[in-house]
Amino acid sequence: MVLTNSKQPRKQRKALYNAPLHLRNSVMAAMLSKELKEKFNKNSLPVKKGDTVKVLRGNFKGIEGEVSKVDYAGYKIIVEGVVNKKQDGTETAYPIHPSNVMITKLDESDEKRFKNSSN
């Protein structure tokens, strides 16, 4: 999905910042695992709550967990098990950009999500 036709980075960024929520879904796509790529004939799908993902980049690389929240306003996802420990001992969820994760298991409760796939 194209938000703008411009090549200029400043206009690309502006289009992302000002995009309506219903168009942000396509930007929130993550790579699929090899098994899911073969099954659905797609390289990536938008991340949804309930999907299981594996973190590929950053301090939490290698952690696998279920997506508990998708923040379309901030282009971030919250994954169970990816937490930041604060000085007082409390743990807070650490938001991750969907481009830094790989979907390993899909939440298949929504039939409309797969209506255009080959299966």
UniProtKB/Swiss-Prot annotation:
- GO cellular component terms, semicolon-separated: large ribosomal subunit
Tell me, how does this one assemble? Part of the 50S ribosomal subunit.
Q: What's this protein's family per the entry?
A: Belongs to the universal ribosomal protein uL24 family.
What the protein does comes down to: One of two assembly initiator proteins, it binds directly to the 5'-end of the 23S rRNA, where it nucleates assembly of the 50S subunit.
* Keyword Membrane part of the UniProt annotation: no
Extract the Pfam families matched here: KOW, Ribosomal_L26
Instruction: Tell me what organism the protein belongs to.
Output: Methanococcus maripaludis (strain C5 / ATCC BAA-1333)
Q: Name one GO biological process term.
A: translation
Entry protein name: Large ribosomal subunit protein uL24
Q: Does the keyword Transport apply?
A: no
The molecular function terms of the Gene Ontology recorded here are:
rRNA binding; structural constituent of ribosome
What are the UniProt keywords, alphabetically?
A: Ribonucleoprotein, Ribosomal protein, RNA-binding, rRNA-binding
